[in-house]
Amino acid sequence: MRSIGLVHAFCVRRCNRLVAGMREDRALLHFRGAAGVHALLLLACAAAPLFAQRAADPTPDAVAAALRQAPPAHPRLFADAAGFAALKESAAADTFARAALGRLLHDADQMLALPPNTRKMEGRRLLGVSRSVLHRVSTLAMAYRLGGNPAHRDRCAAEMLAATAFTDWNPSHFLDVAEMSLALAVGYDWLYHDLDPATRDTLAAALMEKGVRTSLKHTGWVKASNNWGQVCHAGMLAAALALQERDEALAAQIAHRAIVNLPRSMRAFAPKGCYPEGPGYWSYGTDFNVLAIALLEGVLGSDFGLAALPGFAATADYPDLVTGPSGMTFNYADGGMGRDTDCATWWFARRLDRPDLLAYFEKEAFLRYCAARPAAPGRRANRLFAFTLFWLRPVPEGTVPRAPLAWHSEGPVPITIQRTAWDNRTALFVGLKAGSPSAPHGHMDAGSFVLDAEGIRWAYDLGAEGYHGIESRGMNLWSSAQTSDRWRIFRLSSHSHNTLVIDGQPQLAKGNAVVRSFREGPESEAVLDLTPVYTNASKVVRTGTLLAGGTYRLTDTLEGLRPGVTVRWGMVTRAAPGPERTGTLALSEAGKRLRLSALHDPATVWKTYETARPLNDWDSPNKGTVMVGFEAVAPASGALTFSVLFTPGT
């Protein structure tokens, strides 16, 4: 058994128990014989539905002992030779695997004509180059393992050798080192027996010196509580385990460091799986988190309880929860609204036996990606796509998401989700945001919302501003102080979000809006207390109610305003506003309509506000968008109430 296993006897015994008790899985039929079944299970060892309680951190000696039992042969990262053989057999018969291999081989062929990457910095970052190398190496190495074309192997080797010649991998921005290290680790490991000894030694020396040992000198990321910890520990872990026979003590040290520090980043998932940095960074942090766990389980035979940490299993539902029926995400914080395929979602679907996680949005994103045939791999290519092949599984017809219709995330950056149905692409969907602008990648967006209906995204979040363009001007993008340059950027300010602006002033950067109450059920309701992010009101409460007739009511209650101050209610849209602007505003897009009715005052005059053209030369344009809204002046009482009813289809 050890000869075909990815890991030591611990993992083999666990998989033996799974084989004995498992129900028939159609995917397993592609792997004939007991060895084939074990190969697939071991290849996807992280798929075992084990979320046992995490004990205390393991000692360095315990990690070193586990490493001494690790398989000595290459390949060993994510799969051994038998695992790759099983994957190759699956790719010939399984629908998803066949589609994935088609895209993979296409991309690998396109890479043959491209020159290797060079050490070209973008401002303070080498990250774009590291990501390109990771995409190329993982794609070419996987293509060679599954397709056997020597040209893919040779081009992969050339890409890796070019990276070894860089003066360094830019350790001052350690994400760059981490992604480059993951790239060379998998290329070195997966192609080990097909590389000549001199090439292996060159790659190993660069991985050791520019990756692993550099991580002992540049340590600012080691105890990170955000995605840096997940990405950097995964990259360093891959490098150390690929080179374990060259320095076993160092490999054990790096593994132990990852095991005891990853929980710092993983606290973000507690208690219910929401990610404070938004769905875009969920993909980044969670994909690499999954890679780290898969590396530990595959080589050391255990994840040492990491997958049992609070909220981690629950985060499997997060991508679906924050994706509206339009297919766009609730893209709070720095991120785009598109839904891309994620290897982490496939990993969770296997581990938890949850095909419903793939039922709609992930399956569609995956098949869309597989079907595309770009002329050349660009920066938007999915650099971790090759890893997805390890965790593909069937999705039975008729499978639908089983996440709740109404959800309050709790946690440090609370959001609420309300929708009328999962199995109807015209369903109503609303995401509301609380929390603090000073959260990681935060915006001044407390109280902001997105809204889908009739298959259309009506209320938008404009998303992130490009980092390099801001940094190249010398602006301080990463300070959350009240006077920070960050809040001068339109997309990050309260002026661009679907929330209230009082007296033209920004929200309080250190304030923290909370979800006061949340009611589930057919008429779900979220009550957000926004008072802590405003200095110019004694009470600001926003209530969102999903009504039985398929409409949505958003109510704002304000007190303690200075008499005469102006309050603006706003919503960014790509729809065309109708000509009637008193009391009711009709939006139309693609033959669909949404009516906004000012219930609080039928004399309310709806206005439009410029969002498409940049306000400042550092702001990006937001083509095709406009903000609709209205204004009200605080009376002598200092109290205002707004109530807007959203009615789809009229």
PLM features per residue range, with description:
Residues 9-12, 31, 39:
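Short hydrophobic alpha-helical segments enriched in small aliphatic residues
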Residues 36-49:
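Bacterial N-terminal signal peptides
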Residues 76, 370, 469-650:
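CBM-like, beta-strand-rich accessory domains located in the C-terminal region of large
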Residues 243, 284-458, 519-523, 527-529, ...:
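Carbohydrate-active enzyme catalytic cores, enriched for enzymes
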